Amino acid sequence: IILVTGPTGSGKTTTLYSSLLRINSPDTKIITTEDPVEYQLDGINQIQVHPKIGLTFAQSLRSILRHDPDVVLVGEIRDHETAENAIQASLTGHLVFSTLHTNDASGAFSRMIDMGVEPFLVASTVEAVMAQRLLRRLCPHCKEAYTPNPDDLPRDFPWESFSEGKLYRPTGCRECRGVGYSGRMGVYELLITTDEIRELAHERRSSWEVKQAALKSGMRTLRDDAWVKAMRGETSAEEVLRITKSDRAIETEASNA
C-alpha cells in the first residue's frame, strides 16, 4: 500500500493520478474507486462510488478485486471496512494507492490502527506514505530579495544550509494583480517504511517515535522541504509558516489526540 496524506485541497488526487499515469501501460490493469471521479484517465477503469445505492468504497473495492487488477486506487480510506479490504488487496499481490487525513506521514500508521486494523497488518503492508501541502508561489515579476532578521525566523530554520543569505517576499504588481503570488506548488514529506518503522508500528508506538525513525533514515519533513523552496526564492517565509507546522506543534497535537 502507498498512502498520500494531507487536508482537503492539498493536491492528493493530482499526485495519485500522476502516479497512475506513470505506471500505466497496456499490460497493467488499473482500476480505481473514487468520490468523485475528478478526471478521466485513458486506459484506466474508474468507478464512481454511490453510497445511496450501497456502492461504497468498501463494496466497490470487493467488486474490483474480482476483476483481477494489477493496481487499485481507493479514493480515500475512511473506515474500518475499507481499510481492511485495502489491506487484503495488498496481501493478495495488488499494488494499492489511497489517501488518508493525517497531519504528517508518520501519523498514517496510528490512523489505520485506530480504525481497527491489526498493527501487524498495517506494518506489513504499508510500503510508503507521502504527506503534502500546497504553497503559494511568489510572483517572479515582483518578488523582492531581503536579508532576514534571525529574530523573525523560527528556531527550526535551517541556517546551516542558508548560504545565499537572502529570502524573498511578495510586493505585488500588475502581473499578479497586486497579490504578490502567482500559482501554487507542492511541498512533500516521503516516508519509506523501513524494518525499524515496521517494528514500531507493530508495537503500536507513537507517531512521534515513527517520525524520529524516519528522520534517522533520511526523510525530509514538510517544513524542511518548504524551507528549501523558500531559500530558492520560490515562496516566502510567511507562506512556509502559514502552511506547515513545526515538529513541536505536531508532537503536541499527537500527544493530545
Predicted regions, residues:
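Short, flexible helix-loop junctions that flank or precede catalytic/ligand sites
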Residues: 1-257
